[in-house]
Amino acid sequence: MRILLTNDDGIHAEGLAVLERIARKLSDDVWVVAPETDQSGLAHSLTLSEPLRLRQIDDRHFALRGTPTDCVIMGVRHVLPGAPDLILSGVNSGANIADDVTYSGTVAGAMEGTLLGVRSIALSQEYEYEGDRRIVPWETAETHAPDLIKKLMEAGWPEGVLLNLNFPNCGADEVKGTRVTAQGKLSHDARLDERRDGRGFPYFWLHFGRGKAPVADDSDIAAIRSDCISVTPLHLDLTAHKVRAELSAALGVVELGG
């Protein structure tokens, strides 16, 4: 099985090294094409106004000055000697759950792989802070991901669907199970902090946070809060199908394919 790895935290990220160890428990044919620099929060963006510069580190490790989407395209269309059987994106430092999946470059790597017709999985590891220090229990994802991915590959999933895996903030031996979940909902809280530079001109820092909101029992949020691994199937079709009939009636048009 040929596996392509990417991420959004960059080629030097610890999570990418964890992902490679996970992948090597599944196959010896593992390739890495990851961003040269941190691309967190760039979602499914791709580079159109600048050239893509590819740096070969060794036979199967490449760094690209581009986004996770760029990396997947580069890997599939140029770097690999043939199409991959699986694309793994991650392991992200921090969970990618609920609405955050729309911002996530990690999830976007799996989205692009799915668009290219390759089975794709995004992996993220929740963490906590001790003072100013981020504590990421990488061993949780590294321990549980290989067997979970094997089972998922054996089960299979439809075209146009990617899998979003999130590992809880607990030790590997403290995980209480795996849940197949729905994408949750968090309260949106984005703020701008205006400051002044040395010449008095304004600039801004974006503070991105989440407020409290009701949590559904079947959601990805509830799963990782319960120290369970969350497996969320996401599909690329963004159509709000339940609303189509209502809009068709309101506009007096015939709903096709309903």
UniProtKB/Swiss-Prot annotation:
* EC number annotated for this UniProt entry: 3.1.3.5
Q: Where does this chain mainly localize?
A: cytoplasm
Q: Which residues bind a divalent metal cation?
A: 8-9, 40, 92
* Cofactor(s) this protein requires: a divalent metal cation
Q: Which InterPro entries match?
A: SurE, SurE-like_Pase/nucleotidase, SurE-like_sf
State the free-text cofactor note. Binds 1 divalent metal cation per subunit.
What is one GO cellular-component annotation here? cytoplasm
Catalytic activity, reaction form: a ribonucleoside 5'-phosphate + H2O = a ribonucleoside + phosphate
Report keywords, A-Z. Answer: Cytoplasm, Hydrolase, Metal-binding, Nucleotide-binding
| Disulfide-bond pairs as recorded | none
Localization (cell): Cytoplasm
Enzyme class label: hydrolase
What PANTHER family is this protein classified in? 5'-NUCLEOTIDASE SURE (PTHR30457), 5'_3'-NUCLEOTIDASE SURE (PTHR30457:SF12)
**Which family does the record claim for this protein?**
Belongs to the SurE nucleotidase family.
The protein here is known as 5'-nucleotidase SurE
User: What species was this sequence derived from?
Assistant: Brucella anthropi (strain ATCC 49188 / DSM 6882 / CCUG 24695 / JCM 21032 / LMG 3331 / NBRC 15819 / NCTC 12168 / Alc 37)
Cite the source lineage.
Bacteria, Pseudomonadati, Pseudomonadota, Alphaproteobacteria, Hyphomicrobiales
